[in-house]
Design a protein with these regions (language model features):
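Membrane-interface interhelical linkers
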Residues: 15-18, 69-76, 164-169
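Aromatic-anchored segments of alpha-helical transmembrane domains
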Residues: 27-37, 92-102, 152-161, 204-213
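Juxtamembrane helix-loop-helix connectors linking adjacent transmembrane helices
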Residues: 36-52, 62-126, 133-134, 138
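Select subsegments of transmembrane alpha-helices in polytopic membrane proteins
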Residues: 17-25, 82-89, 151
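N-terminal, membrane-interfacial amphipathic/helix-forming hydrophobic leader that caps
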Residues: 1-70, 190, 208-217
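Transmembrane helix-loop-helix hairpins at the membrane interface
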Residues: 107-217
């Protein structure tokens, strides 16, 4: 059995990263289908809360296997900077101001608030900020702003589900605008502070606050 030379190893690494990046974008499509099925109530909330972790776990897994580090996937604990705190505070206020006025109060469900809401917030950040954003950064290399915007566009499109319930397209576009702008904020903060932990916590808190409401038709 021949031993690969150093040059072969160097050549293989970019190829592995391109394949891993393509796989993560394919996972985004699968995750979008999964989210749409959940919006259409084809998946139960417990099932979706559990299955929703798979895209992030698989996405991070293929990136790490391709040679990206845990730091490049923002899977580390690091302090929250003042600027990062300011951005997260702005996202928190903006997101709740955008979604709560169109929600219908249903009352507190403690399992929904303290199990499903955190599960959704953490799983979304695991995929979008720790898998999709690093994949976009790998694809666009030095064009970091473009990569962050692209991952935010895909985060917005991930919320297309209401369109399949008959919601008018302009309203769906407005719905997708909220996660698009929030995604830019989360993406900036995660890159700035080098960790996805704070975005996971804040995203979960948004859904804890919103959990007593129902949205959509």
């Amino acid at each position: 059995m021949s031993i690969p030379t150093t040059s072969e190893t160097v050549v293989d690494r970019p190829v592995k990263r391109r394949i891993a990046t393509a796989m993560v974008f394919c996972l985004w499509l699968a995750y979008t289908v999964l989210q749409t099925l959940a919006v259409m109530q084809r998946l139960s909330e417990p099932a979706y809360a559990a299955i929703g972790f798979l895209p992030g776990i698989l996405g991070v897994g293929v990136l790490l296997a391709a040679g990206l580090s845990r730091e490049e996937c923002y899977l580390q604990i690091a302090p929250l900077s003042r600027k990062g705190l300011g951005v997260l505070a702005a996202v928190f206020v903006f997101a709740l101001a955008a979604i709560l006025p169109v929600g219908v109060w249903q009352g507190w469900d403690w399992i929904a608030a303290f199990v499903y809401a955190p599960a959704n917030g953490i799983s979304q950040e695991l995929f979008f900020r720790s898998a999709l954003m690093p994949a976009a950064l790998a694809a666009f290399k030095k064009r970091t702003t473009l990569a962050v915007i692209l991952h935010s566009i895909l985060f917005g499109l991930w919320h297309i589900g209401p369109l399949f319930l008959g919601t008018p397209a302009p309203i769906v576009a407005a719905i997708m605008l909220v996660p698009f702008l929030s995604g830019i904020g989360w993406g900036w903060q995660v890159r700035r502070d080098g960790t996805v932990v704070w975005a996971m916590i804040q995203h979960s808190l948004i859904w804890v606050v919103a959990s007593p409401f129902t949205f959509g038709p």
